[in-house]
Amino acid sequence: MFKYDINIANYDTALWKAIELEAKRQEEHIELIASENYTSPRVMQAQGSILTNKYAEGYSGKRYYGGCVYVDQVETLAIDRAKALFECDYANVQPHSGSQANFAVYTALLKPGDTILGMNLAHGGHLTHGASVNFSGKMYNVISYGVNKNGYIDYEQLNKLATMHKPKMIIGGFSAYSRVVDWDIMRQVADSIKAFLFVDMAHIAGLVAAGVYPNPVPYADVVTTTTHKTLAGPRGGLILAQGGSKEMYKKLDSAVFPGAQGGPLMHVIAGKAIALKEAMEPEFKIYQHQVVKNAKTMVNVFLNRNFNVVSGGTDNHLFLLDLVDKNITGQEADAALSYTNITVNKNIIPNDPQSSFVTSGIRIGTPAITRRGFNETDAYQLANWICDVLENINNEVVLNATKKKVLNICASHPVYS
């Protein structure tokens, strides 16, 4: 028999020390990785609940195990909230990750060897949109579109490639693109060749939920997302669709279970349900608007200090700094900023002369700093500190002074007070 007062700290000191150190790091570092965020204590409570004990293969009302009456209620809540939030009539909340959600979409709608048209990873796409090292690049014939010289998606190129190669599926979505995607144009191109339009909105789901970024659901045949990132929930995935056939929805469900997964993670699905409810609150809309305001504020600082921002700006939560003209690699910038307790990620830029391990750019995102209370004034200060570091990456005086400023602002904006 277990007692609720047993804990990790008194049993596994090595593990608890690592957890405590990570908690300290999160409080004392400024998080600018665009795909990271801070989830709420309610979500963590759900994920740490007794729901982790229950196996529930199948779907609500159609389980392969008994004793699922209450976990059925949990999953139904998550499904209903996802449908309401994203204005769709189909939602699968079981994918363990965004990549697994994408895998399910591919296997439901495509056959191995089919042609897909996705955004080039080097131009802002994602591994699962056809990168050669990923399953999507190994299982399918991949054609890639990219951005033009101004850093915007080249829709003319996309249309030409679609007309030439007749892909079975066109993929929209990104991991490092800072502008609004024209879903309508993508729909028109897909219709012209009778292709599926699949949108991966993992990075922008929170913005979409708040009405800050155009919703791809009315345009796409199917949409996937992660539930962390801008949505600020637990790590996991969703599959969404509107106006599709029962046959397609059945294929999507079957592709998740039993096609790619076994038992769903009911404690994580509960976390998704809480996060989706939180995303319906007025405060969430205010938060998402602030995410974009902070990103735009930071971009303006970099431009004013003669840094090159890919596409010249941002319409969402992220942007890329092109450091070629500064003679700094992304790897060097990442390391220097890390020393000052500012966390970014090195990132390839369009036509990058460096390898993907070194890179010539860094990606910066504002969801996490906004979640802990940063406003435009804070974002303005932070961007200037980053400029100071990047202009003085070997100057310990500047680096140490910046680290002190970072610790002070983190103390005044705690993540979990």
From Swiss-Prot:
This is Serine hydroxymethyltransferase. It comes from Baumannia cicadellinicola subsp. Homalodisca coagulata. Transmembrane segments: none annotated. It is found in: Cytoplasm. Belongs to the SHMT family. HAMAP family: SHMT (MF_00051). Its cofactor is pyridoxal 5'-phosphate. Its EC number is 2.1.2.1. The modification N6-(pyridoxal phosphate)lysine is found at residue 229. It catalyses: (6R)-5,10-methylene-5,6,7,8-tetrahydrofolate + glycine + H2O = (6S)-5,6,7,8-tetrahydrofolate + L-serine. InterPro entries: PyrdxlP-dep_Trfase (IPR015424), PyrdxlP-dep_Trfase_major (IPR015421), PyrdxlP-dep_Trfase_small (IPR015422), Ser_HO-MeTrfase (IPR001085), Ser_HO-MeTrfase-like (IPR049943), Ser_HO-MeTrfase_PLP_BS (IPR019798), SHMT-like_dom (IPR039429).
